[in-house]
């Protein structure tokens, strides 16, 4: 087959992350076939890293870490108060315990907080997947759909797990499957406040003076599926929120 470096360069730029050294020559004989081959890989779009945890595992780990941190802080506070009262120790120890440490960079010599550690591992795995991609066709699809079904990485330790479990798992499958996985994932439910949505006539809604939260329903209709210029109404949003809330 004749070499077609121009089409190869176009394929790498338009569908991937651009050409690596020697990449144009590698696929010049069949640029289209190279793209299809990346789609056909059994592990296309997947990330396999032993130190990554599921969304549920991340939440449990952070819950336990936070409980231990609060317990340590409480114990330290009790010891300071006891020392200040002269109980169980040298009263002169209190001022020393309260003395400020030497000025240094925040967290110098310490591990980052657990949520930060989880984020950094997820970010590195995502970066490595992009760098290691031969072309990057599938990885760009992952990025597109992660942006379409976005959640807030700043406020959720589940963001990395969400991308792996809802987006990567369905990136080459049916849109309906990805839609269901994304909208029902805890990261999305929390991001769009659906955990706060309560049936207004339910016992819980009446006792707590709470009602429906329409954020998720509106986002699904307005941004994730139909779009802003379609014919759904406010009544559709409200009824959809009722269905989602149960």
Where are these regions (language model features)?
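Active-site-surrounding "flap" and adjacent substrate/cofactor-binding loops of secreted or lumenal enzymes
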Residues: 5-6, 21-117, 202, 206-210
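Short linear motifs at secondary-structure transitions and domain/linker junctions
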Residues: 13, 105, 119-121
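Alpha-helical structural elements
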Residues: 10, 58-60, 140
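Primarily short, surface-exposed interaction patches in extracytoplasmic proteins
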Residues: 1-4, 19-29, 35-36, 117-246
């Amino acid at each position: 087959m004749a070499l077609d470096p121009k089409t190869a360069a176009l394929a790498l730029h338009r569908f991937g992350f651009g050409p690596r050294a020697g990449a144009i020559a590698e696929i010049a004989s069949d640029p289209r076939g190279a793209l299809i081959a990346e789609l056909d890989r059994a592990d296309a779009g997947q990330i396999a890293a032993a130190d990554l945890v599921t969304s549920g595992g991340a939440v449990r780990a952070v819950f336990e870490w936070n409980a231990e941190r609060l317990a340590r802080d409480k114990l330290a506070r009790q010891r300071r108060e006891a020392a200040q009262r002269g109980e169980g120790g040298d009263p002169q120890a209190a001022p020393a315990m309260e003395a400020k440490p030497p000025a240094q960079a925040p967290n110098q010599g310490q591990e980052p907080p657990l949520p930060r550690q989880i984020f950094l591992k997820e970010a590195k795995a995502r970066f490595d997947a992009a760098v290691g991609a031969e072309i990057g066709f599938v990885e760009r699809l992952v990025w597109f759909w992660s942006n379409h079904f976005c959640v807030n990485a700043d406020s959720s330790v589940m963001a990395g797990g969400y991308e792996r479990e809802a987006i990567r798992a369905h990136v080459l499958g049916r849109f309906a499957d990805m839609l269901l996985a994304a909208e029902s994932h805890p990261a999305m439910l929390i991001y769009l406040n659906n955990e706060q949505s309560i049936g207004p006539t339910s016992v819980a809604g009446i006792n707590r003076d709470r009602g429906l939260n329409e954020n998720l329903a509106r986002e699904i209709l307005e941004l994730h599926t139909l779009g802003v210029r379609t014919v759904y109404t406010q009544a559709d949003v409200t009824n959809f929120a009722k269905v989602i809330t149960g």
